[in-house]
Every structure is written in C-alpha cells, then in structure tokens.
Amino acid sequence: MEEFQGYLELDRSRQHYLLYPLLFREYIYAFAHDHGLNRSILFQNAGYDNKSSSIXXXXXXXXXXXXXXXXXXXXXXXQNQFFGHNKNLYSQILSEGFAVIVEIPFSLRFLFSLERKEIAKSYNLRSIHSIFSFLEDKFTHLDYVSDVLIPYHIHLEILVQTLRYWVKDASSLHLLRFFLHNYWNSFITPKKHITFFLKGNPRLFLFLYNSHICEYEYIFLFLRNQSSRLRSTSSGIFFERIHFYVKIEHFHFVKVFFDNNFQCILWFLKDPFMHYVRYQGKFFMASKDTPLLMNKWKCYLVNLWQYHFSVWFQPGRIDINQLCKYSLDFLGYRSSVRLNSSVVRSQMLENLFLINNAMKKFETIVPIIPLIGSLYKSNFCNTFGHPISKPSRTDSSDSDIIDRFLRICRNLSHYHSGSSKKKSLXRVKYILRLSCVKTLARKHKMTVRTFVKRLGSEFFEEFLTEEEVVFSLIFPRTYSTSRRLYRGQIWYLDITSINDLVNYE
C-alpha cells in the first residue's frame, strides 16, 4: 500500500489531483491484479479468466492511449474498431483499472479513518448462531419490525451525479458515463427487485453499488437528525470481517463483522425509539410502542427513493409486523423471538412487604412455516411441504449428495438448538431426509422403496441420532438426561458459515 501511495503522490504532483491520467499508467492494471492490495482496501478481486494477463493489460493501455478518441467516434458502429473481437475482455480490463482509480479517494479516506479510530478486537469468537442473540438486550424493548429490500433500479445518470460529490475530475466522470451506457447490460442481470452482480462482473459496479448505498444512508441519517429533537444514542459504520466477535453487554459497543455478497459495510443507527441495521441488500427497522413511528419512516423512505433516486417503490412492499409474530431472515437463517414475562419476587430486609418485579425473557423459537418456505424455494419440497428430488444434484457423487443434505440438516438443527419447542425440527429433518433419498433414487433410476431397501436403515440414523451421539460423549446416557437436554436450550458453537439455503433465495 505504501508503494501505491507513492505512485499516487507522484501523479498528483504532475497532474494536479486529476485521476483521469492514471488510466494510462500500466501499474494501475498491475494493482488491479494484486490480491494483497485488494484486501487492504476492502474490495476483493472480481477475477479474470486465463486470457487476462499483464500483456493484455499493457495492450489495452496502449490502445486506450493511442485510439481513445477513435473509440468514442466508433461507439455507434456495428463493429467497434477499438475493442474489436476482444470487446468484452478489453472493456473488463479497462473497467477494472478505472475502478482502482475511482477507489483512490475512498481508500485513502478509509485508511485515514482507521488511523484515527482503532477497531477493538476480541479473539473469543462466537458462532454465527449469535446473530440474533447479540440483540437480545434490545429486543425486549421493541414491538414492531420491518424487513425491507433496498431498491437499486436507478438511472445511470444518478450514479454519476452521486459520484460528483466525491470525484472532482470531470474527465473521469465522462469516462464513467461512457462505461455505464455501453456495457451496463453486459455486466449486470436484473432479478426480482434488485440488481444482483455476477461473479465475473468488474469491481466497478460493486463500487457503484456501495456509493449508492452510502448516499442513501447519509440522507437517511440527515432526515433522522432533522425529524427528532433527541440526538442519536449511537451510530457508526462497521467494516466487514469474516468472523463474529464476542458479544459485549452494551449494544453500541458490539462489533459484528461479516463478509457478504455485496461487499458492503454494516451500518446501524440506534436511538430511544428506532433501530436500523443493514446487511447485504436488506435492512431491518424496529421501534417500540405504536407503529406510528414506523409509518412515518415508511413515508420518508418511499419519498426518498422515488423523488431523489427516481426509483419507483411501492409503499406496500414495506410491511410493518409485530416482532412477536414475525420471523427474521438473516444470512439464510430464520429466527423468531418470543418475550415471556416472568415475575421475580423479592423481600426487603426488615420489612414485611414483598416486591414483584415483572421481567421480559428473550426466547427464540423455531419458525416452522418460514423454514418450509425456504426449503420450497430451494426445491427440497413443494408448496405443501412434501419432499421432492433435486435434479440439479444428480450429477454429483452419492457421497457429495449425502454430505450436502447432512450439512444443511446439521446446521439448521445446531442453529436452533438453543430454541424452545424444537419438535418442529423433526418435520424439517423429514423433508431433507426423504428429498435426499428421492434424489439418490432418481440418480440410480430406481424407485424410492427399492433404493431404501438397498440403502438400509443406517442411513436414516445419521439424520436422527447425531445430537444423541454428541450428548452421550458428554453426559451419561439416561432417559431423564436425554429428555432434559432435548427440551433444554443448548447452543452449539460450530456454525461458522452462512446457511446453504441463502444461495437459493
């Protein structure tokens, strides 16, 4: 990174803070290939194929320096003389290099912020099952929650105008507009109500997405400060990490870092009445007492997206649900919370009267209906919960198919092991077990009955007795002990990956 800053200072002294001339520097494309640099400035390399090499990057830089004007003139022609038959390859290389250039102001600002603000670290790692548990001290005071998908179908010019506040180089903005209008359709694919980036997409569009989210949340924070007389209790930006750190008692000290598909930072806002947490392309918004505050912010968000970002967003897509009747979906895992009231009776010394203190207990439950809905989206069952085979898995080996089903079953079982009323998990295990059998029977072109007889009953024991085997290694094998452990809340600490079902939602 020091070498990168040295190159940057050299070009700044010559070009008077212009970013556009850096496009003709060959070392910029070398930095685009450097994985170490990418890790230091938060962005992962989008990846090249085997045809991409330093020679191709040098040829693209030389072509850009020699025929940049001819490329703009031939943009409307049927055969682009600048890119030729390697249009996609050269455009990808140039966009990767341009992405490194426009990241310069942001990366330097990020490094400067890290020098001023030290991130507290803890090496006592918690499992991914504590995603919801780290909010348990605050859930007891919340009543309503909204789970909203952030819209992203915005006009290309709005993206350019957003970057005008950060990048002052007009030439770079014109080149960005050229990339967007010519290669937008080849780099992104629309799905549902959000634009999902393909794995082979350039980092440029990943950068544009983060810029859009950053602009939206700055305006969101400004509206919050203008609409309330109370100052925000805490707000901040959490930079992504891979592991979850230890849960600390106070929420505004909790450091929750994770790696996600959009490479976005985690942002949260907390005040006495409203909580806001964003992850990936969604955000949670929760409040207490009445849904009046949630309806007000619903109007704010709809007007912000429609009039500022020119995104048509239907107000009906923002549902305001009671927290006790709603299941939260986070990184592929679903959890529902239930607040049980308990009374603690205490007696003052040397006094005859008793004091009853009513307390709310945070308790997670297994949301069986949303879980079956996730299995239906992943083609493990139909809409009625009847198991079906997965044709896409028939090309894999038998061991890979069984391991995949067992891993999903084990993760769901371990994740909800600390929940109450875990008997509904038997339905989920049944769907996964029978779907696995039907997939294997379809692969071997046999009936389910014939394949089960051939497989034997030992296969089903792997789905059913795993928890009992773990318990038997720790506790004595007695009926009362196993029954108490089954009903009790025991958290597993080995779930360190995102649920496989998240890839299909």
Curated annotation (Swiss-Prot):
Gene Ontology cellular-component terms listed: chloroplast
Main localization, broad class: plastid
Function: Usually encoded in the trnK tRNA gene intron. Probably assists in splicing its own and other chloroplast group II introns.
One family name in Pfam for this protein: Intron_maturas2
Identification of the protein by name: Maturase K
Sequence similarity: Belongs to the intron maturase 2 family. MatK subfamily.
Key word Chloroplast present: yes
Highest taxon, organism lineage: Eukaryota
PANTHER family: MATURASE K
GO-annotated molecular function: RNA binding
Keywords, ordered alphabetically: Chloroplast, mRNA processing, Plastid, RNA-binding, tRNA processing
Compartments, record wording: Plastid, Chloroplast
Single Gene Ontology BP annotation: mRNA processing
